[in-house]
Amino acid sequence: AKTFYYVASVTAAYRKALDQYLANPASDTFDLPYSVLDELNRTSHRHYSPGFYFGKEKALQTPSHTYVRDWDFIGTVDSWEDGVAHCTQRSKFCLGDSLEILQPDGSVVPVTPEWIKNAEGEAVDATPHPMMQYTIPCATPLMPYSLLRMQKRQ
């Protein structure tokens, strides 16, 4: 089963690819935008290969059957008002972490919150509790159901 984060990320990538192609469908060449593969690499996935596209004789197998998980889904945006995003935690992040917010329209907003406040309005250093309600500053207007993610620490 795939998570709604996976579905949202893959749908955003496919939408970008389709829009790019449909901008000039009569063209003999189509270069997939880097942003499409970049978005696909932000989800949990197995290594990519052309598989059997070039026939059984030239089939390529991936080097590993393990999943690539370089990014964590860390929360959802419930609402945004006056430069403040109201969010629900899915995984922990800490003050100073660099985040990305994937909006329902496929746009991505980078943000490094200057503060985090819990549901009581108290400043906190992290979001350690499952389904914790918190707020962070974000100057860019955000749509409800936007998804927060963070690159895993090495």
Predicted features along the sequence, with ranges:
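Surface-exposed amphipathic alpha-helical tracts and adjacent flexible/coil segments at the periphery
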Residues: 1-154
